[in-house]
């Protein structure tokens, strides 16, 4: 899939789950499942509940996403 096809959203992490997965509430109120991107895992960037994040979602499955940026608090 080309990167141009990804949809970017902002949201807040509501819960940290096992296996580097998170439950994120988007700005429009929808709750989805998300995981940290490979670079975030490689550099061991910690994501906690309450963090503001930017994530990418495929237009084909709007229930899952990939967190690609954690905003500074």
Swiss-Prot record:
Q: Does the keyword Cytoplasm apply?
A: yes
Q: Where in the cell is it found?
A: Cytoplasm
Q: Does the entry feature the keyword Cell membrane, yes or no?
A: no
GO CC annotations on file: cytosol
GO molecular function per UniProt: ribosome binding; rRNA binding; translation initiation factor activity
Which part of the chain is the S1-like domain?
1-72
Pfam family example for this protein?
A: eIF-1a
Q: Where is the chain membrane-spanning?
A: none
Tell me which UniProt keywords the record has, alphabetically.
Answer: Cytoplasm, Initiation factor, Protein biosynthesis, RNA-binding, rRNA-binding
Chief place of localization:
cytoplasm
| Family statement | Belongs to the IF-1 family.
Q: What does this protein do?
A: One of the essential components for the initiation of protein synthesis. Stabilizes the binding of IF-2 and IF-3 on the 30S subunit to which N-formylmethionyl-tRNA(fMet) subsequently binds. Helps modulate mRNA selection, yielding the 30S pre-initiation complex (PIC). Upon addition of the 50S ribosomal subunit IF-1, IF-2 and IF-3 are released leaving the mature 70S translation initiation complex.
Describe its partners and assembly state: Component of the 30S ribosomal translation pre-initiation complex which assembles on the 30S ribosome in the order IF-2 and IF-3, IF-1 and N-formylmethionyl-tRNA(fMet); mRNA recruitment can occur at any time during PIC assembly.
Recorded protein name is Translation initiation factor IF-1 1
**Gene name of this polypeptide:** infA1
């Amino acid at each position: 899939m080309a990167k141009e096809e990804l949809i970017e959203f902002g949201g807040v992490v509501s819960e940290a789950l096992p296996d580097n997965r998170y439950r994120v509430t988007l700005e429009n109120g929808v709750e989805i499942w998300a995981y940290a991107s490979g670079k975030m895992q490689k550099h061991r960037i910690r994501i906690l509940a309450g963090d503001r994040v930017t994530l990418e979602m495929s237009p084909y499955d709007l229930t899952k996403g990939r967190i690609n940026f954690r905003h500074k608090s």
